Amino acid sequence: MLVLFGQPENWHEQDFRAVDDRVRGGSSISHLTEEKDSDGKSRAKFWGTLDTKTLGGAGFCSQATNIKDRTWNLKEFKGIELDIAKSDSYKYTFIIKDCHQDWETSDEKSSLSYEYDFTPIYSKEDQVVSIPFSEFKPTYRGRPVEGAPELDVSKITQFSIMIRSFFNSQSGDYELVLNSIRAIPKNVPFTTHKMSNEKQRLFDDYEKEIAGGSWCICQ
């Protein structure tokens, strides 16, 4: 495994920055803070409050890499592995970009994102979510994009972890603790991950709604 962030090295809070719905007038807030486990190993806690009242049911919080001009070449790898130390039952999104943001302004420059949604098992125990690069879907401001180019894994410019409301399907305080984020070599098998039937139904309804052209304020 190629460690991108975290164990066995330390997490660095300055490598990430908040990109929340406040950029669109919302009230949600996110943090990424480094903490130590019982063995003194570094972990990253993604936490905050997802608000859906201000924007009428919509909302999102995210922490994006904040490393100017950094590019990752992962063409010798086949996916991303999230080593999760602790989680709630919310649905999260892991996002990759292969286009640099506009670092000269304080506003986010909209660009194509490649996203994967996952729902960790509610647990204080370690769990792993493995994501093939082929499963990352192109989106623009939360909407699927048909005919978009494939993710160029040879020039990845940004990673993000996000929680969004999925049209008021979830809100409130959240917390996801990560041991590490790693790239998976081509000769290493993937793990599998499932969500409850009820949560799957809610988010399937969300996918149908955005595919039908409903308004979306998600990043």
UniProtKB/Swiss-Prot annotation:
Q: Give the record's GO biological process terms.
A: mitochondrion organization; protein-containing complex assembly
Gene Ontology terms, MF aspect: unfolded protein binding
Q: Does the keyword tRNA-binding apply?
A: no
User: Which superkingdom?
Assistant: Eukaryota
Work out whether the entry's keyword set contains Nucleus.
yes
SUPFAM superfamilies reported in the protein's UniProt record: Galactose-binding domain-like (SSF49785)
Alphabetical keyword list = Cytoplasm, Nucleus
* A single Gene Ontology CC term: cytosol
Task: Kindly list the places in or outside the cell where this protein is found, as annotated in its UniProt entry.
Answer: Cytoplasm; Nucleus
Principal subcellular localisation of the protein: cytoplasm
Q: Which InterPro entries match?
A: Galactose-bd-like_sf, NADH-UbQ_OxRdtase-assoc_prot30, NDUFAF1
Which family is this sequence assigned to?
Answer: Belongs to the CIA30 family.
Q: What is this protein called?
A: Uncharacterized protein C9E9.15
